[in-house]
Amino acid sequence: DSPKIEYTLRTIKSVIRSCEIAKRSFKDINIKIIISDDNSNQENLDKINQILQSTNIETQIISIKDNEFNDTISSVDTNGDKISDNMISNMRNILKSIQIAESDNSDLFYFLEDDYIHVDDAITEMLFTYEKISSQINDELFLCPADYPYLYSSIESSKIFFGNMRHWRTVNETLITFLTSKIMITKYIDKLKLMGTKRHHPMELMLHEIYEKEYCLSPIPSLTMHATNINSMYGVPPNFDWKKIWDENK
């Protein structure tokens, strides 16, 4: 029942801490945290900036301009129904994140919604796992940091991999938080942009179509908690000490 900004602040704190821990294992890695912002009020921006100033990791807030992308976002969904202003804001953030990834030549990109609180070793585990599994399958892939409860609501076959300190299983669905490579972004840029220009049902449908062709893995147990939907099938993962993670990121 906390205000939405509280989820965001704890998400940022947890990601920063996890990135700082990851740099101990990956000495030469260059990590940059970029926040796309769509008209947050100054009070909330000040709170975010205060957290960003506490780390030596490179950080940046990029504000989405007024009416940016509005001409490319369809005002109706695939059913012909008008979409809400809040949904348009979400889609603007998706398009801004993809735009940033398009113009940057980093090897890996982690697209993160603003309500995922991470365990300390989340980034370390994802980096080691990506490196290991991509070599094992001789290809790029997608990693989702959350072991969503809803993924157990149907009976699906999974392939099991061993990452760094966790098992990972193949999944066919995620929300819009995932890690992948620049190669994959370039390969599927049109589908990724469709998530921001047309409201599908589910919103992540284009991702799910990509996962029909590419590996997407999620960890067992989870590396993150989807805080906004904590009481739903998209919230607290199995065998996850949510209160500990919540309290550690005050």
Could you describe each region identified by the protein language model?
Residues 182-250:
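C-terminal catalytic/acceptor-binding lobe
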Residues 4-7, 11-29:
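Short, acidic, metal-binding catalytic loop of nucleotide-sugar glycosyltransferases
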Residues 1-12, 44, 85-94, 118, ...:
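Phosphate/oxyanion-binding active-site loops and adjacent basic polyanion-contact surfaces
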Residues 77, 108, 117-192:
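Conserved catalytic core of nucleotide-sugar-dependent glycosyltransferases
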Residues 37-38:
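Acidic ATP/Mg2+-coordinating residue in the GHKL
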Residues 90-95, 123, 172-176, 197-208:
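Conserved glycosyltransferase catalytic-site signature
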Residues 41-106:
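Active-site-proximal specificity loops/subdomain of glycosyltransferases
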